[in-house]
A protein has these predicted regions:
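Long, hydrophobic/aromatic-enriched structural stretches that serve as scaffold segments
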Residues: 49-55
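Selective for proline/serine-rich intrinsically disordered segments
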Residues: 40-42
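Primarily the internal scaffold of c-type cytochrome electron-transfer domains
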Residues: 1-37, 56-85, 89-205, 209-254
Length: 254
């Protein structure tokens, strides 16, 4: 992950003595290659749940072990089972190819909010398949049960209140001795609270825009920044030039 040198020292201080102070973020598929090493350690630290969103292990393994047991298993215990990164079946039903939810944590988060995720519209599903992984989460209790802290809502304040009530924190800062929450990647929550999410724009509308080939219209599965294809993303709604739209984004993200 690229880090602005001007921010590097502050980042190191923020994560001092924590692994994120020194370790670069790897791609999900690359991280899977390290599982053999974990098998050689006497007690591999990381649970399967910690990397569930980086692999397409298949629901059959989770069903065979049970969700609780699956989450609490170590990488080393699974061994050769964990060989594939994200694949078609994570988002698509293998029989019908319809969008579907394969991750229990998302279904359970909806249930705790009194919602039935099976009633989601096709447009909502174009974001919910992403929300299986691109979210804030934590490992609840000694069983390390993968949980989304959405019971009170999607805002930062909502999730902070949830964690305060649960008495949860990720680690104690080594200098300040302050309990710290480390947000993972709350992409879905941020999108839902933004103007695009509020107006019904899905993740796929911007990151997997429609394209046509051979008279067939389908979502582009080369997932990337909307700025790489402004004519098919931003300009389907916004009438400004590509240069203006791109500069607007750069200015807001400075």
């Amino acid at each position: 992950r690229w880090v602005d040198p001007a921010c590097e020292s502050q980042i190191i201080k923020m994560w001092i003595y924590h692994i994120f102070a020194i370790r670069d973020s790897l791609g999900g598929n690359i991280q899977l290659f390290g599982t053999k090493k974990s098998q050689t350690q006497p007690e591999p630290v990381e649970t399967i749940a910690a990397q569930e969103h980086k692999q397409s292990i298949g629901n059959q393994v989770m069903e065979a072990l049970g969700v609780d047991s699956f989450y609490n298993n170590k990488w080393g215990a699974m061994g050769a089972e964990i060989v594939n990164p994200i694949g078609c079946s994570d988002c698509h039903d293998p029989e019908t190819m319809n969008l579907h939810i394969s991750r229990p944590a998302l279904i359970e988060a909806f249930q705790r909010q009194g919602k039935d995720i099976t009633k989601a519209t096709p447009q909502e599903m174009r974001s919910l398949v992403c929300a299986q992984c691109h979210v804030e989460y934590y490992f609840k209790g000694d069983g390390k049960y993968l949980t989304f802290p959405w019971d009170k809502g999607f805002t930062v304040e909502d999730m902070e209140a949830y964690y305060d009530e649960a008495g949860f924190y990720d680690y104690i800062h080594k200098l300040s001795r302050t309990p710290i929450l480390k947000a993972q990647h709350p992409d879905y929550e941020i999108a839902q609270m933004g103007i695009h999410g509020q107006r019904g724009v899905s993740c796929a509308d911007c990151h997997m825009p429609y394209k046509s080939e051979g008279g067939v219209k389908f979502s582009d599965h080369h997932i990337q920044s909307p700025l790489a294809m402004i004519d098919r993303t931003c300009q389907t709604c916004h009438r400004e030039s590509e240069e203006t739209l791109r500069n607007n984004v750069y200015e807001r993200q400075r």
